[in-house]
Amino acid sequence: MEVKDTNCTSLGYGKPPWIFKGSALYQLHLVKAENARAFIPKECKLVEAFGYTLGGFFLASYDDSPAGIFDELVVIAGLVWNPPTSCAWAARVLVGSDEACLHGRKVVGLPSQVARFSKKITALPQKPESKSSSFLRRIGLRTSSNYKNHMDVEVTEIKKQTAMSICNINVNATASQQDSKGWMGPLIKMSLPNFSGRTKYNSDLLKYSCQIECRVRAVQPAKVSGPSESDADKENSSEDQSSNVESVSRVPRGTKRNFSISVMLSKPILALEFNHLKMRVEAPTTVTACSHDTT
């Protein structure tokens, strides 16, 4: 099914694989299948059950990458069949770097947009913890409740000369996050396969993988709130003015941002904190079509 590598040495990123280091929050949501399908090509089969698929978001802060230091929010629409497993499909990728945005669009086929990440940390008193909860937390079977700070991350998309609020993510920061000696979970290695492409910047259907090595543990899901109505109206007006640009995407004009926000606001089921993250992104390959054979 894979036929060729894409041109990966352009745009200043150098040759693959590309290495990203930092920390991240990986939060899984139950996403309505009808919303996820708005982003996924017709030839790809959505993994769904009872009208829902598994999506969510990946909020990362990189302190070392081919594009330097920057923040990233990947909104995951859902899972697409790739027998015998499945691949994630990104609905929107917001990055705090022009270089990362251009590379994502042109090389990896991602729906990337430049964004501003504004962070505000507020100190909170720590809550008492029982002996049993403390033991379970240390072995990774219970989320920590010793919150020392919480952090609000306001994500604002920068489109031409317009700034539009996407969402606010309230992340609970635990005491051990502030203390490098704190227990941050077991060291794991895993592979996250992804489909991408079918955009106005890259019309090919692509597949790439992220090889992740990090300390991981379960945490309390972040609380997400959407933008104000004025920002929503601003986005729709901006989309209308740029309607002469044809997109390969199936998402109706003026709704891409709204569908992405609906994914962010959907029901969270699991949140994983990645510390000492090292992510190795392989070169994307062009595929002929998504396989529908799930047997």
Swiss-Prot record:
Gene inactivation effect: Pale yellow flowers. Absence of neoxanthin and reduction by half of xanthophyll levels in petals.
InterPro entries recorded: ADC_dom_sf, NDX1-like
Endpoints of the signal sequence: none
Biological process per Gene Ontology, one example term: xanthophyll biosynthetic process
The protein's role, per its UniProt record: Required for neoxanthin biosynthesis. Probably not involved directly in the enzymatic conversion of violaxanthin to neoxanthin. Is necessary but not sufficient for neoxanthin synthesis. Seems not required for abscisic acid (ABA) biosynthesis in response to drought stress.
Source species taxonomy: Eukaryota, Viridiplantae, Streptophyta, Embryophyta, Tracheophyta
Gene3D superfamilies (alphabetical): Acetoacetate decarboxylase-like
Disulfide bond annotation, renumbered to this chain: none
Region described as Disordered: spans on this chain: 221-251
Name the UniProt record assigns to this protein: Protein NEOXANTHIN-DEFICIENT 1
